[in-house]
Design a protein with these regions (language model features):
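Conserved catalytic cores of soluble enzyme domains
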Residues: 1-66
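Short hydrophobic/aromatic-rich motifs at helix boundaries and adjacent loops
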Residues: 2-4, 74-75, 132-133
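Short acidic (Asp/Glu) and glycine-rich catalytic loops that position anionic groups and cofactors
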Residues: 10-11, 30-38, 77-85, 136-141
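Short capping/connector residues at structural and topological boundaries
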Residues: 11-13, 18-22, 27, 32, ...
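Terminal amphipathic helices with adjacent charged low-complexity linkers/tails
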Residues: 42-103
């Protein structure tokens, strides 16, 4: 955030053509591409945070297309039962709930690495492990737009599925 920008032409050209004043952050900063355009999959406050995120992402991916993703033995019991699942989803179908609570209850060690967290928030995509195996997760988020899919969330989901299938 505040150190990286993406745009075709800078603020000076925008000002000379449209007479609008805009700074680099507003034109193509982390918030613009992480929340609005969806060009950025991740944003980080600092470079060290970014490196931690990159390492986490790579822990779910194979070294190449001929190898399986890394297997990491989970610390939790694969036969575990969790009463939270009985309480997360409300009895009334019109009441929203947070799908992240469901995901984090089901996946190994409650560890879910969300991709495009701030973009098209009515759809959740990310990586986790089940039984030590890396999986991609796509889930509607009832807390945002009642989980209804729109163009942005559909593109987000399709893009993530293609990435997982590569």
């Amino acid at each position: 955030e505040s150190t990286s920008h993406m745009f075709v032409t800078g603020p000076n050209v925008i000002k000379s053509v449209t007479h609008e004043e805009i700074d680099m952050e507003g034109l193509g900063g982390a918030a613009v591409h992480g929340e609005t355009s969806g060009v950025s999959h991740f944003t980080s406050e600092t470079e060290p945070d970014c490196i931690v995120g990159i390492k986490k992402l790579l822990s779910f991916l194979p070294q190449n297309n001929l190898e399986p993703p890394p297997f990491i033995e989970p610390d939790d019991d694969p036969e575990r039962e969790d009463d939270r699942l009985d309480r997360v989803v409300p009895d009334h179908p019109e009441k929203p709930y947070n799908m992240l609570d469901v995901i984090e209850t089901v996946v190994d060690d409650g560890d879910f690495f969300e991709v495009h967290k701030a973009y098209a928030q009515n759809l959740i995509v990310g990586f986790a492990r089940l039984g030590g195996h890396s999986v991609g997760i796509v889930a509607q988020q009832p807390m945002v737009l009642a989980g209804c899919l729109d163009i942005a969330s559909s593109l987000k989901g399709a893009r993530f599925v293609r990435f997982c299938d590569a």
